[in-house]
Amino acid sequence: MFDQLVTFLYTRDLEKSAAFYGDVLGLPLVLDQGACRIFKTSPEGFLGVCRCSERRPSNPEGVIVTLVTDDVDGWYERLKAKGVTFDTTPEGNVEYNIYHCFMKDPDGYQIEIQSFRDPAWPRPT
């Protein structure tokens, strides 16, 4: 097993995306590499936003970043109060036994806030 996970997203506007993840979502910035900023999402999970280039274009299609929490409703209300527009309200999904809602980041990446209702899901220790 690996020690940590970093997911990188490419952005056309690094300052706008960094403000969204840092100021709006409240994720702590752990490393500023100039063209990339890496935020902590959980004890060993990280999300990096990097300035796109011709070699690494921004391509949000087919990407979903899922942030897992037991407080989906609380996050929904807090982020709505900060002006975030959601694509869906929090709702249950019987097929996957989850409770979730969706929004998009400034580049159009789909962000899901989700809670697993399945007792088999490994909870943080």
Explain the meaning of each model-derived region.
Residues A19-F20, D73-R78:
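Short amphipathic alpha-helices within nucleic acid-binding modules
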Residues M1-E15, V63-V65, R117-T125:
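N-terminal beta-strand motif that seeds the catalytic metal site of vicinal oxygen chelate
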Residues F46, T66, H100-C101:
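Short hydrophobic/aromatic beta-strand element in the GNAT-like acyltransferase core
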Residues M1-D3, P57-G62, V94-E95:
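Short glycine-enriched loop/turn motifs at secondary-structure junctions
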Residues K80-T125:
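Vicinal oxygen chelate
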